[in-house]
Amino acid sequence: MRVLLSNDDGVHAAGLRALAEAFHGDEVWVVAPDREQSASSHAISLHRPLRLLEVAPRWYAVDGTPTDAVYMGLNLVLRDARPDVVVSGVNHGPNLGNDVLYSGTVAAAMEGALLGVNAVAVSLAAPPPHDFGEAARFAAALARQVVARPPPAPVLLNVNVPPGPVRGYRFTRLGRRTYGNEVVEKTDPRGRKYYWIGGEGRVHNEDIPGSDCNAVLLERLAAVTPLHLDGTHDPMFQELRSWTVPGYEKEPAP
């Protein structure tokens, strides 16, 4: 099996190395950002050149985003030898609920799916110090299932693993998390103000049965959530059929 690995924590991250070890015996290629890129979402570099450095055999660093890394991995490094699966992680911390909208880990996997390759994003929902081995092994086992039982269209599976041995897993839906939404103001030695987004506010996880948040944080199960690349809000789409915009003609739906 040929595997393309990436992440958002950087090419030298411990979680990425654990993932590579979990695919021992497979043909593993790594194309990852050259530095930490957490919460970079699906940003792609269109207005500056990118550099690609082979830091070890089949192990590449890109001076760009996680999306840049997977894009270059599929369209340059492995252009003539498509991988069977793209796996992103192991992320240092969870990507649950609305985290997926900000996550560079999830975005790297999503880029793989957008480019036609089944993909898995994996995160360890634990504070440091991190032991990534169990999360990496679970992700590798799941990735092999994806390759053995390929879906009709490219799939993206978002995996979150609690600390310790995986005693079980559940297929889940995305939960909902409420962030502190703080902006912390500081002053530098020259008297100028600067700001940190987020601060140290607590994150509230809504108690939603069947959600990834409940499975991982309350029941200590690994959560596997299939993410749909079509972001259309279907109930609102149906509602809009009854709307009119004054002064403009509405064309009938095809």
From Swiss-Prot:
<keyword id="KW-0479">Metal-binding</keyword>
<feature type="binding site">
    <location>
        <position position="91"/>
    </location>
    <ligand>
        <name>a divalent metal cation</name>
    </ligand>
</feature>
<comment type="similarity">
    <text>Belongs to the SurE nucleotidase family.</text>
</comment>
<feature type="binding site">
    <location>
        <position position="8"/>
    </location>
    <ligand>
        <name>a divalent metal cation</name>
    </ligand>
</feature>
<keyword id="KW-0963">Cytoplasm</keyword>
<dbReference type="GO" id="GO:0008253">
    <property type="term" value="F:5'-nucleotidase activity"/>
</dbReference>
<dbReference type="GO" id="GO:0008254">
    <property type="term" value="F:3'-nucleotidase activity"/>
</dbReference>
<keyword id="KW-0547">Nucleotide-binding</keyword>
<dbReference type="InterPro" id="IPR036523">
    <property type="entry name" value="SurE-like_sf"/>
</dbReference>
<dbReference type="InterPro" id="IPR002828">
    <property type="entry name" value="SurE-like_Pase/nucleotidase"/>
</dbReference>
<dbReference type="GO" id="GO:0005737">
    <property type="term" value="C:cytoplasm"/>
</dbReference>
<dbReference type="InterPro" id="IPR030048">
    <property type="entry name" value="SurE"/>
</dbReference>
<dbReference type="Pfam" id="PF01975">
    <property type="entry name" value="SurE"/>
</dbReference>
<feature type="binding site">
    <location>
        <position position="9"/>
    </location>
    <ligand>
        <name>a divalent metal cation</name>
    </ligand>
</feature>
<dbReference type="GO" id="GO:0000166">
    <property type="term" value="F:nucleotide binding"/>
</dbReference>
<dbReference type="GO" id="GO:0004309">
    <property type="term" value="F:exopolyphosphatase activity"/>
</dbReference>
<feature type="binding site">
    <location>
        <position position="38"/>
    </location>
    <ligand>
        <name>a divalent metal cation</name>
    </ligand>
</feature>
<keyword id="KW-0378">Hydrolase</keyword>
<protein>
    <recommendedName>
        <fullName>5'-nucleotidase SurE</fullName>
        <ecNumber>3.1.3.5</ecNumber>
    </recommendedName>
</protein>
<dbReference type="GO" id="GO:0046872">
    <property type="term" value="F:metal ion binding"/>
</dbReference>
<comment type="function">
    <text>Nucleotidase that shows phosphatase activity on nucleoside 5'-monophosphates.</text>
</comment>
